[in-house]
């Protein structure tokens, strides 16, 4: 791109050095002329054959105010380019997974799972599917938000219901695979239109990827891309959930059974899924102390404190001194340390937010004109390795100790689908004190990360979303 370093985007952001690029645009560092804060600027040629930045900015605008949603600072046309300015974020979960030698501990995965499910739940509550759930599209924040997970890349997002009437999109078949084949749901491979259940099934594959280090359908060879997708589909369909989750806690089997039991239009019980993992977290004696695997690698003293408290809890049956959100927090991973490992947190963000599809994915990013919102003026707008031990045995050998979940929602459902699988009860229940402590820790974690949005900003965001909602409703639901 022929932009100069002294260019000012939207009259507010001074363009800095290029920090990434790909098939769908280029990413630059920028500095706010008003506050001096760094931001990320994504650019694409205004005359590109398949523009997507305007559509993506609309999604960002509609999601503003949600926890773990990057702030959209500005979008518009700058010279010969479409420009979108958003928060500068840290490394992706894929980057951190690689940093941790491609295996995460059960504790880290459970801490992540709670936030990841919440991010997907929020998108769904706003009427959109993500359709490309993968580790690359979840980034950690920077500075005070270094322990918060952000969801990004809405280029493949799709409206699954009318934003006002909540009418669900119709069931369809013979659809092309949209998203990343490695994490795509079975129904997506079979050509079924995606709905909320598919985002959650994809998230389940992400969690098992972190625990196992890889998935059974990785590394398959084929002559063509279509043949490779077919091989991945065959392997995924033929791999029983119990085999995929073997040697890991049965809660993961229950997670997949629930996701696959959902019918096309069913509203998922997100609270049930989070409760599955929260109860497991409590029974394992973990504390919600923000000590992820990458934190422990950078700051061994944090890991030692966490291990000591966990050991004390197992020994006495009482919470360790560090339990709960009010306990002293471990030293957090710094921006500088992140940059040391990943050649810059900025680059880590850049690589995943703008580069084109990798060999194992099939991005159906091209949109027809009727899928793009009508053009408006510029809008201002997570060192114990994965528990692959015999103590869990086969995941199907013991029942899951989880609370009963409500029956399926009262929403309209597609009649053709699989029968519902019931979760079994049993197992050792934690004490009331343990459950109260862990519930408070998890609740405190989420509430702290949301404190950055002050009342005025929420009000302004609400106004922007309402205006965007009205413009979106001028569109027909995407095919």
From Swiss-Prot:
Could you state what the record's PTM comment says about this protein? Answer: Autophosphorylated.
User: Which portions of the chain have biased composition (kind: Basic and acidic residues)?
Assistant: 328-337, 454-465
Region Cortical microtubules-binding domain (CTD): what ranges?
A: 302-479
Q: State if Transferase is listed as a keyword.
A: yes
Alphabetical list of InterPro entries matching this protein: CK1_Ser-Thr_kinase (IPR050235), Kinase-like_dom_sf (IPR011009), Prot_kinase_dom (IPR000719), Protein_kinase_ATP_BS (IPR017441), Ser/Thr_kinase_AS (IPR008271)
* The keyword Oxidoreductase is assigned to this record: no
Q: Which domain of life is it from?
A: Eukaryota
Family to which this protein belongs: Belongs to the protein kinase superfamily. CK1 Ser/Thr protein kinase family. Casein kinase I subfamily.
Q: What does this protein do?
A: Casein kinases are operationally defined by their preferential utilization of acidic proteins such as caseins as substrates. It can phosphorylate a large number of proteins. Phosphorylates tubulins and microtubules in vitro. Involved in anisotropic cell growth and cell shape formation via the regulation of microtubule organization.
What protein is this chain from?
Casein kinase 1-like protein 6
């Amino acid at each position: 791109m022929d932009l100069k370093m002294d260019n000012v985007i939207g009259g507010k952001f001074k363009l800095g050095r290029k920090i990434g690029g790909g098939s769908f645009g280029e990413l630059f560092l920028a500095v706010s002329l008003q506050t001096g804060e760094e931001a990320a600027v994504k650019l694409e040629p205004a005359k590109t054959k398949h523009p997507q930045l305007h559509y993506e900015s609309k999604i960002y605008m509609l999601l503003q105010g949600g926890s773990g949603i990057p702030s959209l600072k500005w979008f518009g046309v700058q010279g010969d380019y479409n420009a979108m300015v958003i928060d500068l974020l840290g490394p992706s979960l894929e980057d951190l997974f690689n940093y941790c030698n491609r295996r995460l501990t059960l504790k880290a995965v459970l801490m992540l799972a709670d936030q990841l499910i919440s991010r997907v739940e929020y998108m769904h509550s706003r009427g959109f599917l993500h359709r490309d759930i993968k580790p690359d599209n979840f980034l950690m924040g920077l500075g005070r938000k270094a322990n918060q997970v952000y969801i990004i890349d809405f280029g493949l997002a799709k409206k699954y219901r009318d934003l006002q009437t909540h009418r669900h999109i119709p069931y369809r078949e013979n659809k092309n695979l949209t998203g990343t084949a490695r994490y795509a749901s079975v129904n997506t491979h079979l050509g079924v239109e995606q709905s909320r259940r598919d985002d959650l099934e994809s998230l389940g594959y992400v969690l098992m990827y972190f625990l196992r280090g890889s998935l059974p359908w990785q590394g398959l060879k084929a002559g063509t891309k279509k043949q490779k997708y077919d091989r991945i589909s065959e392997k995924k369909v033929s791999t029983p959930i119990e085999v995929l989750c073997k040697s890991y806690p049965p809660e993961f089997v229950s997670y997949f059974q629930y996701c696959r039991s959902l019918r096309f239009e069913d509203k998922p019980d997100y609270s049930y899924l989070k409760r599955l993992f929260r109860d497991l977290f409590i029974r394992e004696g973990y504390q919600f102390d923000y000590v992820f695997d990458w934190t422990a690698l950078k700051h061994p003293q944090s890991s030692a404190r966490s291990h000591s408290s966990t050991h004390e809890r197992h020994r006495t049956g009482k919470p360790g001194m560090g339990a709960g959100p009010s306990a002293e927090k471990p030293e957090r991973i710094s921006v500088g340390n992140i940059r040391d490992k990943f050649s810059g947190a900025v680059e880590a963000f850049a690589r995943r937010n703008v580069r084109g599809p990798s060999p194992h994915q099939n991005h159906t990013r091209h949109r027809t004109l009727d899928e793009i919102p009508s053009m408006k003026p510029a809008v201002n707008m997570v060192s114990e390795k994965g528990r692959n031990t015999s103590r869990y045995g086969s995941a199907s050998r013991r029942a899951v100790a989880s609370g009963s979940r409500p029956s399926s929602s009262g929403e309209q459902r597609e009649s053709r689908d699989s029968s519902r699988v019931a979760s079994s009860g049993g197992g050792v229940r934690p004490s009331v004190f343990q459950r109260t402590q862990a519930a408070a820790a998890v609740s405190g974690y989420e509430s702290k990360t949301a404190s950055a949005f002050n009342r005025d900003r929420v009000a302004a965001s609400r106004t922007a979303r309402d205006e965007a909602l009205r413009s979106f409703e001028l569109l027909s639901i995407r095919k």
